[in-house]
């Protein structure tokens, strides 16, 4: 079965390579050196990607960046690695954060720090915010270019809060307040459910461990070597997931599905609070039918310290196998993306985080966060504390598969089929087999 699936991706990668790398719309200028970028965004975000490329292309006369939609995040990662094995990789590929370890060990990438050194382009990476820089660096060197960065935050329905007699300007700050606010909302009939979440493993397991400075996996979450075991079935993990399961039975919490399946539950007013990616702010500003606000992730309080949340989204990886003059164009494009003015514009347009301090300073000087206060929540949460070995990120092999394992066990727990301890124990056991198999491949 695995061979069949891989063969399908291999053939698709070859097709994308032949279309994306060797054939171009007539509008592409033939005299320019092409830089082929496989990306994973659709809709308005794809339009923003196209606009970025057009801006760079108009800024100079030598290179032509050519974005190409290669599928979902997981599809794009698989296709890019298959294309690399077929010796037809793109120059750039957008890979989500859970693919970091796979890319690092693939042998298919040209590290960004090395690319910039080779082309004598200086970027002060120290100005990038610490959680972003630490997630994608190895031994202090940046391996991929941070691009669309986000972190989970809490959204809440101000109308529902008002109907329940709650202060619409004050979101809950602790999990105890989430429970109390939800109970008030239910009793007042202001909403049928208190809160829901998106991307359950990312928001409720990965980020909750980091937010409370708890270890997620061995080897300092994989940063000190190949992790071979998750640590999510300890006292903290069982406490948190067990409480979610109890709240599910009391209608305080409603499990809404994986990824963005719960969006409609919040947007239709069924759940008054929603923990989801900060990347949705722009979309909610355009389409949410009621007034809403944002708050930091709820915290359990003592004895757990409040740390920083984890970064999400994706970075741009440079692939091996191209000519020197083409890499010069790649380096110039990444330099273009790193400019503070470009970071500021990207944040304003998409809602993704501006990831350098100069860009943040420019936004603050312009009064942007006073005008759009919901946009500050994610920045404040990410930068409130220096990352620790437990909160700088998670670097696991086959992380996509591990997330699927965790979320399947969460679903069994929330359905009442297993206790939190049973489900998390099984998630650890199954993921251990995946991690050990991955480690064996790269030893």
Question: Language-model segments: what does each one mean?
Answer:
Residues 97-153, 179, 206-210, 293-295, ...:
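Hinge/lid segment of periplasmic solute-binding proteins
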Residues 179-184, 222-256:
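Glycine-centered hinge/linker elements that transmit conformational signals in sensory
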């Amino acid at each position: 079965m695995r061979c069949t699936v891989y063969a399908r991706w291999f053939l698709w990668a070859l097709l994308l390579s032949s279309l994306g790398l060797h054939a171009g719309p007539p509008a592409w200028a033939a005299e320019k050196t092409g830089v082929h970028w496989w990306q994973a965004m659709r809709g308005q975000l794809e339009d923003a990607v196209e606009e970025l490329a057009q801006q760079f292309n108009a800024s100079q006369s030598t290179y032509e960046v050519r974005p190409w939609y290669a599928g979902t995040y997981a599809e794009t990662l698989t296709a890019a690695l298959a294309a690399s094995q077929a010796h037809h990789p793109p120059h750039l590929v957008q890979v989500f954060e859970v693919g970091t370890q796979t890319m690092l060990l693939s042998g298919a990438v040209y590290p960004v720090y090395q690319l910039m050194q080779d082309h004598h382009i200086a970027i002060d990476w120290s100005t990038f915010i610490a959680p972003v820089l630490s997630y994608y660096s190895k031994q202090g060197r940046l391996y991929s270019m941070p691009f669309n960065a986000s972190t989970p935050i809490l959204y809440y329905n101000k109308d529902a809060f008002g109907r329940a007699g709650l202060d619409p300007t004050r979101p809950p700050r602790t999990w105890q307040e989430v429970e109390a606010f939800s109970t008030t909302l239910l009793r007042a009939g202001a909403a049928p459910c208190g809160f829901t979440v998106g991307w359950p493993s990312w928001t409720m397991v990965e980020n909750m461990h980091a937010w409370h400075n708890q270890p997620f996996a061995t080897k300092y979450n994989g940063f000190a070597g190949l992790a071979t075991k998750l640590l999510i079935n300890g006292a903290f993990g069982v406490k948190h997931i067990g409480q979610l399961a109890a709240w599910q039975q009391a209608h305080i919490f409603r499990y809404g599905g994986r990824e963005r399946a719960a969006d409609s539950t919040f947007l239709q007013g069924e759940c008054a609070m929603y923990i989801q990616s900060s990347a949705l702010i722009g979309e909610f500003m355009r389409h949410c039918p009621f007034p809403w606000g944002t708050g930091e992730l709820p915290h359990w309080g003592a004895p757990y310290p409040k740390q920083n949340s984890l970064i999400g989204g994706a970075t741009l990886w440079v692939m091996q196998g191209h000519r020197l003059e083409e890499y010069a164009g790649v380096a110039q494009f990444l330099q273009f993306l790193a400019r503070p003015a470009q970071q500021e514009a990207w944040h304003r347009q998409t809602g993704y985080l501006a990831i350098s301090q100069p860009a943040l300073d420019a936004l603050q000087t312009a009064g942007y966060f006073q005008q759009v206060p919901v946009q500050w929540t994610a920045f404040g949460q990410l930068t409130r504390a220096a990352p620790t070995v437990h909160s700088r990120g998670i670097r696991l092999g086959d992380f996509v598969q591990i997330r699927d394992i965790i979320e399947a066990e969460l679903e069994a727990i929330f359905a009442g089929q297993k206790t939190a301890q049973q489900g998390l124990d099984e998630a650890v056991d199954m993921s251990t087999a995946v991690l050990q198999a991955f480690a064996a491949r790269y030893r």
